[in-house]
Amino acid sequence: MADLDDIKEGKDFGIDRPQQNTLYTLKGCGSLDWGMQSRLARIFNPHSNRTVMLAFDHGYFQGPTTGLERIDLSIAPLFADTDVLMCTRGVLRSQVPAATNKPVVLRASGGNSILSELSNECVAVAMEDALRLNVCAVAAQVYIGSEYEHQSINNIIKLVDAGNRYGMPVLAVTGVGKEMTRDARYFSLASRIAAEMGAQFVKTYFVEEGFEKVTASCPVPIVIAGGKKLPEHEALEMCWRAIDQGASGVDMGRNIFQSSAPRAMLKAVKKVVHENLNAREAYQFWQEEKQGELK
């Protein structure tokens, strides 16, 4: 029996209006498949096209480093305040409740330690397991200028090929070769190579001079590494300068979980990244939040 809806007149087909197609505006990602864009849209805030990632994957080569002795005590209280979690699959399965419902960037390279050559890494996670864990991206180091440069680039290529097959973005993390200087020229080289190999976004270090050239010459989003622990005002200054010079976010670990007020620091970093607070304003915000956190 025909439904009345089939013969009813007066439907609005919008014949006078062309269909609107919403473009995905994240840098360099407009032509990616839907699944890839969907995962990236969970990592990068669709309104700001920026992200704040909480890195606590250090144990994959450093073991129980300061601040990460007990993930459940030091990191779990920060889950609610970050945009993204960056960790290993071991910690994800054992320490992160599925109900946390935060996008995850999964550490997918390893096979080394602080006692050996750091650049000697392999792909340490099968793409099928990353999919099983429902993560939003996988991450691997790329060591340009190191003894194992070719191997690290090949790791990125393998992950990119598998990621393209399944709609999984790849984050390339620029490690520093022993013979290379930490300057804009080196990080421009490393970041560009990672992007050319197909990484959908790149994590690199902020440099005092020429960082705007690093971001400008990389065709995909760059997030900065937090690096070693700095005084809070210096870390916030670094965040602000990086965002001002074209970074699409930060991936911070030690400058968050080793802070005297970690949750306040994480909130202050988000203020810089998403609300464009300058370093002075963010530091004042941190001081105010710190009082409440330490009560």
From Swiss-Prot:
Keywords: Cytoplasm, Schiff base, Transferase. The keyword Phosphoprotein does not apply. It comes from the Bacteria. GO terms for molecular function: acyltransferase activity, transferring groups other than amino-acyl groups; fructose-bisphosphate aldolase activity. It catalyses: dihydroxyacetone phosphate + acetyl-CoA = 3-hydroxy-2,4-dioxopentyl phosphate + CoA. GO terms for cellular component: cytoplasm. CDD domains: DhnA (cd00958). InterPro entries: Aldolase_TIM, DeoC/FbaB/LacD_aldolase, DeoC/FbaB_aldolase, FbaB-like, LsrF. It is found in: Cytoplasm. Pfam families: DeoC. Its main location: cytoplasm. The active site is at K203 (schiff-base intermediate with substrate). Its EC number is 2.3.1.245. Involved in the degradation of phospho-AI-2, thereby terminating induction of the lsr operon and closing the AI-2 signaling cycle. Catalyzes the transfer of an acetyl moiety from 3-hydroxy-5-phosphonooxypentane-2,4-dione to CoA to form glycerone phosphate and acetyl-CoA. Belongs to the DeoC/FbaB aldolase family. Homodecamer. HAMAP family: LsrF. This is 3-hydroxy-5-phosphonooxypentane-2,4-dione thiolase. It comes from Klebsiella pneumoniae subsp. pneumoniae (strain ATCC 700721 / MGH 78578). The gene is lsrF.
